Amino acid sequence: MTETAWDTYATQKPQRRPVNAAGETTWFNWTQYPDHGPGAEILGTGRGSSVLEVGCGKGGNLAHVATLGARAVGVDLSPAQLRAADARWADTVELELHQADALDFLARCTDTFDAVFSVFGAVWFTDPARLLPTIRERLRPGGVLAFSQRPPVEGCYGCQASYINRSEDEDPLVVKRWDYEPPRWTQILHEHGFAEATARVLPAPPGPRKIGTLLVRASA
């Protein structure tokens, strides 16, 4: 069911535009707004680093990581998302893409990474009590976990339902997500062995939309 849900989502999510406002063909975007917010510097990695994205989708952020000289590994549950990533980036950068559930991939993975990240990805849609320990095990000493997602709705914390619409004749597909306020995220990360955890809500850019972006960073 979940694989079907994310394949359905893939058909609704447009491919990343060819260039950003600065004319760049690859870039890193933590937020739901184009040309807004910090970039890959949050990861603290560079040439020769090994970086994993959990829930890599169509690979736009991961491709930018690869252009910075890092080994870029991505895992996603959706075959449709990975096909789109391969079609877009195969002739441009080298990505190591794996079709799997993030928990399953991490359980069998023997590599370690300098950074693991998720942008509206697997960290949002996986129980942190199960996911965070497996990420912690695969991070090198001092390695970084960073992730972004929408902030929680006031009073709606923990496991929540998200709906992915289908045709008018079909019920939406349901996936679970985990929402917490910034102080609770830092507490959860510390409980699972992470250090120097920070969490903040980046404000939306000027304009009619007001919802910001939750950005969380912690070190192993």
Locations of regions flagged by a protein language model:
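Conserved class I S-adenosyl-L-methionine
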Residues: 1-47, 60, 144-176
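Class I SAM-dependent methyltransferase SAM/SAH-binding core
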Residues: 50-52, 58-104
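A short acidic, Gly/Pro-enriched loop at the edge of an enzyme's catalytic core
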Residues: 107-116
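A short glycine-rich, Lys/Arg-flanked "PGG" loop and its adjoining helix->strand segment in the class I
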Residues: 129-144
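Short alpha-helix
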Residues: 176-193
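Conserved S-adenosyl-L-methionine
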Residues: 194-205
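C-terminal lobe and adjacent flexible extensions of AdoMet/dcAdoMet transferase-like proteins
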Residues: 214-220
